[in-house]
From Swiss-Prot:
Protein name: Imidazoleglycerol-phosphate dehydratase
Cell membrane keyword on record: no
Annotated catalysed reactions: D-erythro-1-(imidazol-4-yl)glycerol 3-phosphate = 3-(imidazol-4-yl)-2-oxopropyl phosphate + H2O
GO biological-process terms attached to the record: L-histidine biosynthetic process
Organism: Cryptococcus neoformans var. neoformans serotype D (strain JEC21 / ATCC MYA-565)
Gene assigned in the entry: HIS3
EC main group: lyase
Keywords: Amino-acid biosynthesis, Histidine biosynthesis, Lyase
């Protein structure tokens, strides 16, 4: 069984990012290592939840131009994570391909549906009522999720079914995504490409 591990370095005039992802943490067999430091506390919290509940190990460090705002850091971290995810998946053989999940957090309930398709698309409904959650702009939540989807080459739909607390709305969305990813990338035991086209890695 081949390892699904990948690293990405992303450097621009706005950010410097290193990201390593291991898609196959096995409880009781391998140690799940998660270390996220983006300079944005709430973003760290969301990416940590994504890795934890997605069954992944994740090392993600970023130094960005936060003296301007959170846009470049949040967007570029999501792009790097998506690139590493796509690289780790490789030829996308022997996986379920589709994943879906619901995740509650108190009064909030979110749904995520993903297709590991090489057809980047993103739809989202997260009705935030505040400008920020912690030090992350709420408008960046959907934007960074879109950035991840396009960099990873996946179709992604995320919806808040209900929720009042903005922290809970965001966190339940990330946890639903984590569980959907975990389903979609799970191995089937075969080596087939789950597509009538015969190829998914484009």
């Amino acid at each position: 069984m081949s390892e699904r591990i990948a690293s990405v370095e992303r450097t621009t005039s706005e950010t410097h990012i290193s990201c390593t992802i291991d898609l196959d943490h096995i409880p009781g067999v391998t140690e799940q290592k998660i270390n996220v430091s983006t300079g944005i506390g709430f973003l760290d919290h969301m990416f940590t939840a994504l890795a934890k509940h997605g069954g992944m190990s994740l090392q993600l460090q970023c130094k960005g131009d936060l003296h301007i705002d959170d846009h470049h850091t949040a967007e570029d971290c999501a792009l790097a994570l998506g690139e590493a995810f796509k690289k780790a998946l490789g030829e996308r053989k022997g996986i379920k391909r589709y994943g879906y999940a619901y995740a509650p957090l108190d009064e909030s309930l979110s749904r995520a549906v993903i297709d590991i398709s090489s057809r980047p698309y993103f739809m989202c409904h997260l009705p935030f009522t505040r400008e920020k959650v912690g030090d992350l702009s709420t408008e960046m939540v959907s934007h960074l999720l879109q950035s991840f989807a396009f960099a990873a080459g996946v179709t992604l739909h995320i919806d808040s079914i209900r929720g009042e607390n903005n922290h809970h709305i965001a966190e339940s969305a990330f946890k639903a995504l984590a569980l959907a990813i975990r389903m979609a990338i799970s191995r089937t035991g075969g080596d087939d490409v789950p597509s009538t086209k015969g190829v998914l890695a484009l």
